[in-house]
């Protein structure tokens, strides 16, 4: 399995685990800027990062959309464990309470947006 396939699979597992632990609705809620919702309909973007990377990526246009909807981020740090993952830390943060973001250009054709990196220690 390729590295990006593993990252995608691990990210999906992290989303599921956060939804279970926080009581979030995931099914049928996924968009480019929202992975789940609180039961009251408030959107949540889930950011999962493998402990070895040390950061998450946030895209400016998706962050702006989440802010417009008064949404939240669910941050997850995990490590691979067998065929799954072990969640090491998780935290919910309102989209207005992120650490200062420094936007940089990206050549990602599909995203067409600037990105910022958020180090794990800035959230935990």
Each language-model region and where it sits:
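Nucleic-acid endonuclease domains
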Residues: 1-124
